[in-house]
C-alpha cells in the first residue's frame, strides 16, 4: 500500500507514502554525479545527474524506493502485485534494465519528463534480480517534473507509459482502471450544496471514498489534489496525510499491521528531500545543494 502525488503549481513538489508491514530504508541517500552506475545490461554511467531519495544500501548499491535528481525529475516505485510482469529478455531490440535499476536509470539520465519518455522507449524492464537474497518486487512507477507526470507499468501486455493527468498513483489495479474509475466521481465537487442546514457545511466531496483500498486512495488523492489550495512541502504533507493509513486500521495478508512507515516530499526548487517518520512524526530534511555532488561514493 502506497500513494504518490505530484503537486503542480509555482512550487512543484512530489511525494509519497510508503505503507508496509515492515520498515524500509536507511534514510535519505545521495548518489553523486561521479558514482559509477553499472547496469546489468552492460551500460555504464560514469558521470550523470546527482540524485537523492529513500534507499536501502546493499553491498554498496542504493536500492531506491523513490527519488529526485538535480534537474527536478522525481520518481516513486509503488507496489503492483498481481499485474507486474517482467520478461526474461528485452523486447523489440531494446536494452534491458532490471526493476531495481529503473530509478537510477531515470534519475541519472533524464533532465526532464520529455527525456524520460525518450529513455523509456529505448529499454525493456527485465526479470533480473539484484541477488538471490534480494528478489525483484512487483512494481509500477510514477514519474513527474514541473510539466506533468506519467505512469510506467510492465505487464504481460508489455511495457506501457501512460500520461497521468490526475497526478497521483496508488497500487494495483493497473493505471487505466484508476483513470476510468475516477469518472464515477465527476459529481463530487467543492461547491456548496445551496441549502442551509446542520449537515450542509462539509458536504462538498460527499461520496468520495474514505477507505484504504488502492482504488479509494487513488480517487481521494486525485480529488484532493484537484480542489485543495495546498502548495509546497507543507501542502503536500497535508494531502498525503489524508491517504496514509495509521497503525492498526489495516491488516496485511500476513496478519501484521500495514501502516505508513514514512511520508516524503521532494522540492526541486530547493533540491530538498524531506521525510516524516511515522513513529516520531519528526520531519527530517536533506538539501542536495549543501552536499558535494561531484563525489564518487554514496552520501
What are the roles of these predicted feature ranges?
Residues 92, 96-97, 123-169:
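Acidic/His-rich structured neighborhood in mature extracellular/periplasmic domains
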Residues 92-129, 232-238:
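Proteins synthesized as precursors that undergo proteolytic processing into mature forms
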Residues 18, 79, 145-147, 156, ...:
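Short, flexible loop/turn elements at secondary-structure junctions
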Residues 14-19, 153-155, 275-277:
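Catalytic Cys-His active-site segments of thiol-dependent hydrolases/isopeptidases
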Residues 1-13, 119, 128-131, 136-137, ...:
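C-terminus-biased signal that marks the final domain/tail of proteins
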Residues 20-22, 81-83, 157-160, 279-283:
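Short, surface-exposed beta-strand-loop junctions and turns on beta-sheet-rich folds
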Residues 1-94, 127:
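A contiguous strand-loop segment
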